[in-house]
Amino acid sequence: VFQPFFMNLIEGILQANPRAMARAMSLIENQDPQARDILKALFPSTGRALVIGVTGAPGSGKSTLVDKLAHEFRRQGKTVGIVAVDPTSPFSGGAILADRVRMSAHYNDGGVFIRSMATRGHLGGLSRAAAQILSVLDAAGKDIILLETVGVGQDEIEVVKVADVSLVVLVPGMGDDVQAFKAGIMEIGDIFVLNKADYPQVE
């Protein structure tokens, strides 16, 4: 029999209560024993959100693009969840939270939920718990979930496993063409975005 706390938490998530969502995400990230039961209870309410993975090299402008996409989806009347996977601070073990600073314009918008996560040393561009965090946002009824990875390297292509659409952000001048197409990341993209297109290298 589930405890009242558990039932209230599940009910809160299904009603898109930000506090309940944040609490569940913290339990998931901290590998709390209750996390498994939470995800099991939420599972029947998942599978409706469109998950867009945004990946690319460090400094390519992923956060800015995610911010603009969120603005556009909100303009269309859709609710948005944003999961920004940040590098882990070597001192605190937590997320550096650089991405949330860039997305501050959404803080007062009840239709946008933003969560930063630390990789906690996990290779692959995604936190171990990222897919489970997506389930919470999905169950909460978010129409669109934007998943921004850590600036990835050649082998860090986990985003394709959890995203419905993979969006790769490229910047002119960052490595020659051969290097780019050797990289595994070029093989996973459904959409390629050439950012900072006003750079002289574009020509």
Put a short name on every predicted segment.
Residues F2-F6:
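Aromatic (phenylalanine/tyrosine) cluster motif
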Residues L65:
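Hydrophobic positions on the alpha1 helix immediately C-terminal to the Walker A/P-loop
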Residues G94-A98, A197-E203:
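GTPase G-domain guanine-specificity segment
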Residues V165-L170, I185-D198:
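Conserved beta-strand/loop subsegment of P-loop NTPase cores
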Residues K182:
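Conserved SF2 helicase motif VI
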